[in-house]
């Protein structure tokens, strides 16, 4: 650990937006090996998406460097709602929904961080026990309203209005940092760029209650933008989730492998644990042999393995290779559903049918003449096999549990035909 400068590594990766006291943090790291740091997430949903993943990658880097990560599940703050990054009030969730989301997020975090040298806590455990008078007497007196109004997250909402509930959020997050510092030995908070005001409020509270020399540090990460200026984290189909039931490992892998050459090195620095030398070599490959897309393949491999494990990566690569080569016959029925979930689809009955009629009836071909021409020219594949016989009969029961027939026209145009009884 002494030979690894975590802060210099983060700077090289472009992962630091602001720090509260770099000199003080460096001094602390030089003298102590017990730094504990945290990042929080409110249970507003039952899965993180890749945009949420960014600060947790920083936390993971500290864990790999030997430090102690703590994750705060915001069971308390989540019942109120963080105004950061929003122009409108959040819709409050039911207690049942919040608890379900807490359990799901906890499971995801354990998958990413393991169980060694890692803790998960829930701020419901302290915020839920605090009554109104305690809140006002012990903490409310320490916050100046004029300072709170100047925080960007609040100031940006004043024109259209912000409820007292969301206005109070920064106090609750500050209390989180104070409690973690006092009772759990946590010295540092990590968050997105929009969390700067909340983080500094927590540090101020710690210094007021525990003394100005109490170690407390904050670090925010930059807003992640793509080369075209749009916000990172969305695909054409919406958010890219960590939950494999929401975004399959194949879709997850495809998101990363399809990244722009202009973005791929930045993402390798942010989302992988590859050494500087390997990333530098991949950057050179992007410049000299971009058509090989080696950087994208490495990115997709590393992030998919981190989130979905070796098994998820293997499935993603199996499906990708099958679609690329056209050899789909070895895919399972489940893999077919995943791989062609967004492909054009059609329906057909259970009976055997002449291929030409099948192509026209499912509207894959516009006419029998065109269908015969494409079959004769070798442009039609049925379940991975090239068919050049216009008298060929399609047997829906022949593959994929009788649920599908996969038609490929040309090199990449797939249609998934659902068989209806």
From Swiss-Prot:
Enzyme Commission number(s): 6.1.1.1
One Pfam assignment: tRNA-synt_1b
Motif 'HIGH' region boundaries: 43-52
Cellular localisation: Cytoplasm
Any single GO BP term: tyrosyl-tRNA aminoacylation
SUPFAM superfamilies named among the record's database cross-references: Alpha-L RNA-binding motif (SSF55174), Nucleotidylyl transferase (SSF52374)
UniProt cross-references to InterPro entries, sorted A to Z: aa-tRNA-synth_I_CS (IPR001412), aa-tRNA-synth_Ic (IPR002305), Rossmann-like_a/b/a_fold (IPR014729), S4_RNA-bd_sf (IPR036986), SYY-like_C (IPR054608), Tyr-tRNA-ligase (IPR002307), Tyr-tRNA-ligase_bac-type (IPR024088), Tyr-tRNA-ligase_bac_1 (IPR024107)
Residues given in the record as ATP binding sites: 234
Annotated GO CC locations: cytosol
CDD domains to which the protein is assigned, alphabetical: S4, TyrRS_core
Broad enzyme group: ligase
Chain positions of motif 'KMSKS' region: 231-235
Entry binding sites for L-tyrosine: 38, 169, 173
Gene3D superfamilies tied to this protein: HUPs, RNA-binding S4 domain, Tyrosyl-Transfer RNA Synthetase
Record carries keyword Protein biosynthesis: yes
Molecular function GO terms recorded: ATP binding; RNA binding; tyrosine-tRNA ligase activity
Catalytic activity: tRNA(Tyr) + L-tyrosine + ATP = L-tyrosyl-tRNA(Tyr) + AMP + diphosphate + H(+)
Domain S4 RNA-binding: from-to ranges: 353-419
Record-stated family: Belongs to the class-I aminoacyl-tRNA synthetase family. TyrS type 1 subfamily.
Task performed by this protein: Catalyzes the attachment of tyrosine to tRNA(Tyr) in a two-step reaction: tyrosine is first activated by ATP to form Tyr-AMP and then transferred to the acceptor end of tRNA(Tyr).
Quaternary structure, from the entry: Homodimer.
Name of the protein in question: Tyrosine--tRNA ligase
Organism: Lactobacillus delbrueckii subsp. bulgaricus (strain ATCC BAA-365 / Lb-18)
Species lineage: Bacteria, Bacillati, Bacillota, Bacilli, Lactobacillales
Gene: tyrS
